[in-house]
């Protein structure tokens, strides 16, 4: 370890101990040196004994900075890793940190724009940030070319080395988990960290976020349900992103929405429809839809429209996963647990040798209590959560896109019920899912598939005569080969029959000669000639078998 890594490790240990997180170390022989070592650090007492363990963990992660905050947020979606009281606290982690100097942001913008001063591209650039988070911060300005108000998102300077150093330490901790916890290997901690690393590195590339926002905006162009601000891609780079400034009511400000006369029932239902439209129609969904990233337009409160920002994290599902997911939801709410278990095996989410009966029983045991509630009170997100947690006990592979989907669904559901507590998510989603599944089979699906494949067949059409000729020629050669093999097999069969016949005669002569030699000595040389003849015939038959 480098001196810098040692200092950082010391700071992390000191922070964990000051919040009493040594309680998380399991009491076993392997951890005895760790526990004894903790007692030797008597000058680092637990300074927060009045707080519960989950809250202490959350505060410690916030103190450690952006990498650990985001790691905690991601872990909050993996409720198979922690008890509910800890997972609930991790879900409260806020990605808000002190802003960095606006002059540094200005220098980064000028570097990204080829060294020209900010004033060459923007008017009214505000040196004070509008918002600040762990990875980037946002400044307001006005485009010089057309006078439109924009926000400029800038990556924090020197954030990458900090992230890389902390990730190394997190990887080291992850490698210890299978040794410290009896169930540690099944939890695949290294895969969890690898998944987190990919998400974090993606967030550092603002060109990727720009592309995501452009795609989402195109998907919901002219939609009354969702508006994505325009991205000015000519001004975007890996460290800087420029997009339209929006004005809206934060979705968490229920009082302001009600004051504006917003149709809260329609707004809540539209949130559900937006989510399922992204997942099943577009196969491309905003995977960071927490309340801080969602606003509601001031205009047309009777026909409310969401505004989505911060498209750094997105997810996608392939056709097979979408179909299995939709069928899983419908089977779940029909309480067809056998179907759910079979779908998991068919999809490859769990190993093919999984015992379907045992899996069905495990799902039933976990989920039946949920369905004792009225459907309107059942959490779609928690159903999915229980399903995945149960499947992981049967060695379900970590599916990053499904984890993102589960997290997003929990956000959507939480926001929807905050806006309209009577929201029946299943009643809103079921017609959409049934319509989508119906659209995937029958004549409409066949017509769509033919339409999708038409360009391919048009391109291949001129090659078809040649392909047919080649196939016929290969078929002719194949027939010759088959005939040749058949003849050889026939010859071999005849040869084998002859050899078996000769071996039988040889053995008979040999046995007859032996019998006569013992019982009829008066026959003279005859038994001997029979035995010699038997050996000769047997040898001839044996040679034919080779």
Swiss-Prot record:
Keywords of this entry: ATP-binding, Cell inner membrane, Cell membrane, Kinase, Membrane, Nucleotide-binding, Transferase, Transmembrane, Transmembrane helix, Ubiquinone biosynthesis
InterPro entries named in the record: ABC1_dom, Kinase-like_dom_sf, UbiB, UbiB_bact, UbiB_kinase
Record protein name field: Probable protein kinase UbiB
Enzyme class: transferase
GO molecular function: ATP binding; protein kinase activity
Membrane-protein topology: Multi-pass membrane protein
BP term (GO), one: ubiquinone biosynthetic process
Family, as annotated: Belongs to the ABC1 family. UbiB subfamily.
Chain coiled-coil ranges: none
Entry's Gene Ontology cellular component terms: plasma membrane
EC number, as in UniProt: 2.7.-.-
Highest taxon in the source lineage: Bacteria
Cell location: Cell inner membrane
Membrane-traversing stretches: 501-521, 522-542
Pathway: Cofactor biosynthesis; ubiquinone biosynthesis [regulation]
Sequence ranges assigned to domain Protein kinase in this UniProt record: 124-502
């Amino acid at each position: 370890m480098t001196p810098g890594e040692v200092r950082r490790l010391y700071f992390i240990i000191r922070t964990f101990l000051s919040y009493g997180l040594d309680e998380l170390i399991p009491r076993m022989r392997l951890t005895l040196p760790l526990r004894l070592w903790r007692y030797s650090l008597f000058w680092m007492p637990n300074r927060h004994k009045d707080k519960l363990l989950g809250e202490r963990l959350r505060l410690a992660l916030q103190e450690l900075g952006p990498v650990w905050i985001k790691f905690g947020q991601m872990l909050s979606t993996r409720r198979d890793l922690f008890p509910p009281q800890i997972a609930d606290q991790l879900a409260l982690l806020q990605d808000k940190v002190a802003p960095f100097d606006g002059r540094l942001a200005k220098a980064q913008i000028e570097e990204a724009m080829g060294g020209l001063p900010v004033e060459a591209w923007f008017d009214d650039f505000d040196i004070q940030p509008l918002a600040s988070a762990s990875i980037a911060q946002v400044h307001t300005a006005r485009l010089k070319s057309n006078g439109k108000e924009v926000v400029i998102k800038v990556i924090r300077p020197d954030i990458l080395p900090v992230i890389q150093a902390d990730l190394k330490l997190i990887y080291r901790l992850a490698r210890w988990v299978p040794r410290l916890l009896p169930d540690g290997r099944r939890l695949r901690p290294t895969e969890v960290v690898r998944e987190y690393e990919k998400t974090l590195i993606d967030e550092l590339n603002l060109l990727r976020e720009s592309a995501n926002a452009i795609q989402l905006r195109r998907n919901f162009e002219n939609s009354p349900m969702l508006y994505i601000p325009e991205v000015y891609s000519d001004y975007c780079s890996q460290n800087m992103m420029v997009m339209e400034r929006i004005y809206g009511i934060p979705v968490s400000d229920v009082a302001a929405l009600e004051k504006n006369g917003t149709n809260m029932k329609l707004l809540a239902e539209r949130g559900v429809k937006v989510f399922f439209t992204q997942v099943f129609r577009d196969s491309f969904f905003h995977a960071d839809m927490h309340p801080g990233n969602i606003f509601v337009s001031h205009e047309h409160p009777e026909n409310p429209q969401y505004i989505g920002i911060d498209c750094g994290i997105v997810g996608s599902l392939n056709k097979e996963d979408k179909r299995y997911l939709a069928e899983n939801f419908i089977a779940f709410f029909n309480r067809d647990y056998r179907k759910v278990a079979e779908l998991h095996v068919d999809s490859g989410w769990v190993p093919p040798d999984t015992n379907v009966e045992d899996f069905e029983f495990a799902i039933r045991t976990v989920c039946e209590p949920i369905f004792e509630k009225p459907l309107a009170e059942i959490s779609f997100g928690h159903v999915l959560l229980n399903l995945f947690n149960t499947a992981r006990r049967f060695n379900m592979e970590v599916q990053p896109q499904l984890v993102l989907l589960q997290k997003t669904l929990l956000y959507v559901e939480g926001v929807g019920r905050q806006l309209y507590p009577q929201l029946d998510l299943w009643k809103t989603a079921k017609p959409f899912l049934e319509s989508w599944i119906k659209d995937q089979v029958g004549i409409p699906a066949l017509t769509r598939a033919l339409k999708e494949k038409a360009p391919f067949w048009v391109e291949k059409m001129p090659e078809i005569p040649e392909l047919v000729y080649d196939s016929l020629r290969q078929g002719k050669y194949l027939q010759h080969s088959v005939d040749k093999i058949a003849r050889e097999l026939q010859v071999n069969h005849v040869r084998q029959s002859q050899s078996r016949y000769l071996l039988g005669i040889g053995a008979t002569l040999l046995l007859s000669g032996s019998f006569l030699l013992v019982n009829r000595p008066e026959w003279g040389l005859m038994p001997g000639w029979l035995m010699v003849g038997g050996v000769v015939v047997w040898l001839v038959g044996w040679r034919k078998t080779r």
